[in-house]
């Protein structure tokens, strides 16, 4: 009904105003005081997205707002194609996770064949430190053709940037210019925070 749709429109408007007037300015302000964190926490430099948000309602991967692909070694000038239906391309590993696979922790599984069997063997809280030689996370570790890859907000923003998505490039370039930083600063702890902000 029209009243419910009007309420939804108002909620979306308030959320948009909050992001534009609070979230983005706060992220830029805080980041300007902690710019050294743009040089910390860099991962492996490999990023993967599965693709999402069909722009025309079809299942055609080429029509997705967020393309599927892999960026290797921080090279934003080249995006590798990814085939989610190829079990040799994409696998999830749990060797350092609090899960177990029926075939053991050493073997990766394709997400379509994945298992989520809880196997917490970590310390009993409270604890001071985790043993990183064993399980220490509830996350699975994705691999593309055997290479570890990062997924999530930073991967999505970088994939859009590398694919030439105009709005993403404009937003990222604007934020980096305000902070007087190169695109390479995104490969960091604060870069991940900035990616969450830009994605919102």
Give the positions of each predicted feature.
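Active-site bordering "gate/hinge" segments
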Residues: 1-199
């Amino acid at each position: 009904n029209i009243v419910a749709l009007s309420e939804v429109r108002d909620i979306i408007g308030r959320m948009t105003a909050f992001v534009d007037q609070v979230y983005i300015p706060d992220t830029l302000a805080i980041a300007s005081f902690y710019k050294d964190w743009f040089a910390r926490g860099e991962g492996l430099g490999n990023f993967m997205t599965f693709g999402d948000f069909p722009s025309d309602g079809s299942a055609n991967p080429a029509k997705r707002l967020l393309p599927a692909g892999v960026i290797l070694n921080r090279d934003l000038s080249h995006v590798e194609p990814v085939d989610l239906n190829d079990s040799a391309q994409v696998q999830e590993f749990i060797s350092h996770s609090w899960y177990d696979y029926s075939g053991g922790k050493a073997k990766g599984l394709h997400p379509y064949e994945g298992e989520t069997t809880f196997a917490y063997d970590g310390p009993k809280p409270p604890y001071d430190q985790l043993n990183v030689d064993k399980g220490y996370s509830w996350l699975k570790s994705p691999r593309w053709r055997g290479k570890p890859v990062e997924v999530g907000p930073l991967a999505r923003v970088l994939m859009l940037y590398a694919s030439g998505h105009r709005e993403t490039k404009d937003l990222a370039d604007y934020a980096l210019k305000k902070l007087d930083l190169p695109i390479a600063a995104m490969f960091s702890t604060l870069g991940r925070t900035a990616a969450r902000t830009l994605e919102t």
